[in-house]
Regions:
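A ligand-binding cleft/hinge motif common to bilobed small-molecule-binding domains
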Residues: 63-75, 156-186
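Ligand-binding cleft/hinge of the Venus flytrap
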Residues: 26-37, 106, 118-120, 124-147
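General small-molecule cofactor/ligand-binding pocket signal
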Residues: 40-45, 145-146, 183
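N-terminal hydrophobic or amphipathic helices and topogenic motifs
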Residues: 1-60, 66, 73-80, 100-106, ...
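Short helices/loops that flank or line small-molecule/ion binding pockets
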Residues: 48-62, 148-164
Length: 237
């Protein structure tokens, strides 16, 4: 609740925004074991909503897959620090063997293809819309563009269940659907964005120390296949 959020904003605990993510799940599971049993609350929201909430001081940390220049425009006038969380491939979910022969974004406009889309504000939707605009592709030419789902698992399930032919997401979700194939297209970087003035407080130190630890990086890579080469790197935005 908002009351709970406001309470935590003035406590030693942390509110971290973010959607379902194996990386965030691992972090949240490890933080309570840090000294002091740091209380942590996850606020489930997508990248853009999380950054807006950081701007309006409703969360302490935004887990966001957004380029630094996007963060600066969404959270203007503030001194922010980004902690690189992990990197992972983004691509299409299709049926095993790719029977529809889908390979790139222009294929989404074909009359025989139904797309399972994500909601506005999610990094998947941002990637899609930017690519469509730069390629001169009208969203209205894509069957299913207006049908929004709210997670990689839900879009992958739509493809697996035959409600759609293709969806856009990261590689991890496909592990739960043996009937699907993942077609990599690009790489996405996930960050933890926070106010720079909070970096030296115990809660934020616990986050940075946990993510930077060799144990966390190794476990995350083994469990997800994500690239943790630069995990724990910190820079100002």
């Amino acid at each position: 609740s908002l009351l709970k959020r406001d309470y935590l904003l003035h406590s030693s605990g942390l509110i971290i925004s973010g959607q379902a993510s194996p990386a965030l799940d691992l972090l949240l599971n490890q933080l309570p074991s840090t000294p002091g049993n740091l209380p942590v609350l996850q606020s489930h929201m997508n990248t853009y909503n999380g950054l807006y909430s950081l701007y309006f001081e409703k969360v302490h940390i935004a887990c966001a897959a957004a380029a630094p220049e996007d963060v600066r425009s969404l959270v203007p006038g503030l001194s922010l620090t980004a902690l690189l969380f992990c990197q992972y491939p983004m691509g299409f979910y299709v049926k095993k063997g790719n029977p529809r022969n889908i390979h790139d974004f222009p294929d989404l406009t074909r009359a025989d293809i139904i797309f399972a889309n994500r909601e506005k504000g999610s990094s998947r939707r941002v990637l899609l819309d930017r690519t469509l605009k730069s390629s001169g592709i009208s969203p209205e030419s894509i069957s299913g563009y207006r049908n929004e789902l709210v997670s990689d698992y839900s879009t992958a399930a739509a493809v697996a269940g035959g409600q759609a032919d293709v969806a856009l997401g990261d590689s991890y979700a496909v592990r739960s659907f043996p009937e699907l194939t993942f077609l990599p297209l690009t790489q996405e970087t996930l960050y933890l964005i926070m106010h720079s003035e909070n970096l030296d407080t115990p809660g934020f130190q616990a986050v940075t120390e946990t993510i930077s630890s060799e144990n966390f990086r190794r476990t995350l890579a083994l469990q997800t296949g994500y690239d943790t080469t630069h995990t724990g790197e910190i820079f100002s935005i």
